[in-house]
């Protein structure tokens, strides 16, 4: 009987560990939450047609270590670079006036995507706890690769990076804790 109970407890713990998912929210919701509990924002800028974006969803954001770190340290936002949403940021309203629901593949680029200077996908954009953009990181990132940036931008460490040499030293001293 004890072994059956232990088996159920083990399965329950394993289920919690492996079913960890990123709590994706909208940019508007993230900015609202920042007013109550300040945290940096990590935005995944993607498109529906982007193959590497889909791989990053599957291989990186489904990683339990990545999901757990994001949920604890950031407001995680998913933003369709060609979507038809409207959002407010720093007193400005952004939309996609060229959006057409009849376009089944690529669509026009959202004005917020242009404002952020994003021209390739996937791109991860980090924002500080006042919703100011810090840095965009373009390209597919593995869990081990994104961990460096999550660690750098989860607190104020990025403020100490003044040069390429500083970043190189940061990477050389970085110890990964994520599992593949």
Region spans (language model):
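Solvent-exposed coil/turn segments that connect beta secondary-structure elements
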Residues: 48, 81-84, 130, 142
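Thiol-based oxidoreductase modules, predominantly thioredoxin-like and allied folds used
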Residues: 21-24, 63-104
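Structural micro-motif
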Residues: 40, 95-102, 110-125
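A short beta-strand-turn-helix
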Residues: 23-41, 70
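Bacterial Sec-dependent N-terminal signal peptides
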Residues: 1-21
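Short active-site neighborhood of thiol/selenol oxidoreductases, capturing the structured segment around
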Residues: 37-51, 76
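Non-globular targeting/processing and membrane-anchoring segments
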Residues: 20, 117, 128, 134-180
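Detector for the c-type heme attachment site
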Residues: 54-58, 127
């Amino acid at each position: 009987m004890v072994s059956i109970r232990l088996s159920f407890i083990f399965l329950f713990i394993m289920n919690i560990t492996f079913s960890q998912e990123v709590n994706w929210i909208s940019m508007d919701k993230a900015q609202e939450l920042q007013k109550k509990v300040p945290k940096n924002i990590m935005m995944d800028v993607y498109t529906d047609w982007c193959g590497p974006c889909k791989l990053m969803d599957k291989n990186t954001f489904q990683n339990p270590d990545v999901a757990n770190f994001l949920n604890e340290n950031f407001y995680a936002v998913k933003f369709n670079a060609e979507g038809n949403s409207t959002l407010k940021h720093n007193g400005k309203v952004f939309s996609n006036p060229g959006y057409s629901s009849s376009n089944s593949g690529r669509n026009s680029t959202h004005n917020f995507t242009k404002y952020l200077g994003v021209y390739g996908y996937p791109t991860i954009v980090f924002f500080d706890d006042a919703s100011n953009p810090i840095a965009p990181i373009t390209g597919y990132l593995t869990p081990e690769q994104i961990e460096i940036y999550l660690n750098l931008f989860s607190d104020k460490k990025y403020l100490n990076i003044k040069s390429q040499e500083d970043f190189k030293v940061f990477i050389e001293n970085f110890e990964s804790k994520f599992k593949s």
